Amino acid sequence: MKKTDVVIVGAGAVGCAVARELSKYEISVIVVDQNEDVGGDASKSNSAIIHTGYDAAPGTLESQLVVAANPMYDKITEDLDVPFARIGAVLPAITEEQYEQLPGIQEKAFRNHVYDVEFKTREELLEMEPNLNPEVKGGLYIPRESIIDPFILVQAYAENACANGVEFQLETQVTGCLLYTSPSPRDATLSRMPSSA
């Protein structure tokens, strides 16, 4: 039976990011995934947007993590040579009802410590984006909303983690896990999946 300090279940964006971070320490790490490559499942079909957290529910774990993670991507993408662009986003209000919701959305952003969300008039939005619906009444501009290549990002996380000693066991399922109530090592049982070849 192989001993390791940490087993990460899942080689998607989160699993590979955690593996990369843990690879900086003097611990043994194994990443297990049932797929034949990293970045499968949700990581291969996401929106490729790095959010600021402007519209997350204030006080939630989601808002805390998204707001904290957003500024990290500048260094991560530079270190790993991953395509990344802070292109900003526009939240246009076309109807009167949408327009009336803008102050509440901006207030939510401020409560999430995203202070750079700006109100834009109809004219300002059409100057920024001439192809917007001409019925636009105004909107919000979120300058730090960004785009990234999620496939390259996950691959870069995994390659960096691997180069730093993390072991990846792909096509492997976790078939059991023993948990203890007192602080002590946990045991996991792994099973290699039959090859599809």
Regions found by a protein language model. Give the residues of each.
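N-terminal Rossmann-like FAD-binding beta1-loop-alpha1 element of flavoenzymes
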Residues: V6-I30
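A short, basic/flexible loop-to-alpha-helix module at the beginning of a structural domain
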Residues: M1-K3
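Short, flexible, mixed-charge acidic loops at enzyme active sites
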Residues: D41-A48, L132
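Glycine-rich FAD pyrophosphate-binding loop
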Residues: K24-A42
